[in-house]
């Protein structure tokens, strides 16, 4: 899927957000930028904890911040980490699909910024 200028701007916001990540254990800072349909952008970063299971990913933190402010109409999310490939983890995919199964996901794969619909990354989502 071709990336628009708006998609690349969103990716750059995710890159900038990653500087605020709290990743003292993995040293793997991640930033996410979630664009809402109204054009607003909500960012999130990963926040690690010494009790590793309490760590929260950047994508989920962005989604939770948006939901907490009453915003649930998501258009796209960009994820940045200083790695050749950094797609969202399975837990983040499941959380995002709760709100936007066709969410446009932008991330770096093999050093190139790419995008795909969330339904392609999580074809068999869990639903009740």
Spans of features found by a protein language model:
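Short, compositionally biased leader-like segments
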Residues: 1-12, 72
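Short, surface-exposed loop/turn motifs that are enriched in glycine and acidic residues
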Residues: 3-4, 23, 51-52
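Short, basic/aromatic recognition patches
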Residues: 8-23
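Small-residue (primarily alanine) positions within well-ordered alpha-helices
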Residues: 14, 32-33, 62, 66
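Short linear motifs in intrinsically disordered
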Residues: 20-26, 93-98
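Short beta-strand scaffold segments in enzyme catalytic cores
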Residues: 27-36
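Zn2+-dependent cytidine deaminase-like catalytic core
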Residues: 43-128
């Amino acid at each position: 899927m071709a990336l628009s200028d708006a998609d690349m701007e969103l990716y750059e916001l995710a890159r900038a957000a990653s500087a605020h990540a709290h990743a003292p254990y993995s040293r793997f800072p991640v930033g996410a930028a979630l664009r809402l349909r109204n054009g607003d952008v909500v960012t999130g970063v990963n926040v690690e904890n010494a009790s590793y299971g309490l760590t929260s990913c950047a994508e989920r933190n962005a989604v939770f911040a948006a939901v907490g402010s009453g915003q649930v109409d998501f258009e796209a999310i960009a994820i940045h980490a200083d790695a050749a490939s950094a797609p969202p983890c399975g837990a983040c995919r499941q959380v995002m699909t709760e709100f936007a199964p066709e969410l446009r996901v932008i991330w770096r794969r093999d050093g190139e910024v790419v995008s795909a619909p969330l339904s392609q990354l999580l074809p068999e989502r869990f639903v009740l």
